[in-house]
């Protein structure tokens, strides 16, 4: 078979300096368009890619990014940054409304009649792209390939889901409020745990019954 079409195993190997990030950056820089579907996006995850995203904006390379409100994990500031790029369209699949989880991690890159796509375990977070134990597969296909047709079909289905998928301007303020409420709750829980740890645990002797004068 053609070596260019052989699947590749994409993972982080800190000892050898291998990172999932490098594979994604490489494909972004060579593509004519891209589509990304991930559950989680953080500021630290997109920061190393901002120079690349800005370069794609300058070249008018269109991109679509689909994420979710799952667990209120994605950072609104990261979403704001992506949405500010004129070449990127950002949408959010609302799992709270749909009543199901959303764990896709897929990166699709189109170059002429060829598609390269990375599918596996990596979200757009710093740890996933650089440090975590992650397993991904990179596949190369023509547009007619059965696998890419299935992937593209599922992406389009989720992207165009009218009931649960919202564009940036329609979801961001509501999501930002949900995210901030969750952050506040987590902060309160952490503070309560800290206080609980500081409280002295009474010794067993404190609970030992002492005989009164009549019992002596």
Label every model-predicted segment.
Residues 216:
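Pre-Walker A adenine-sensing motif
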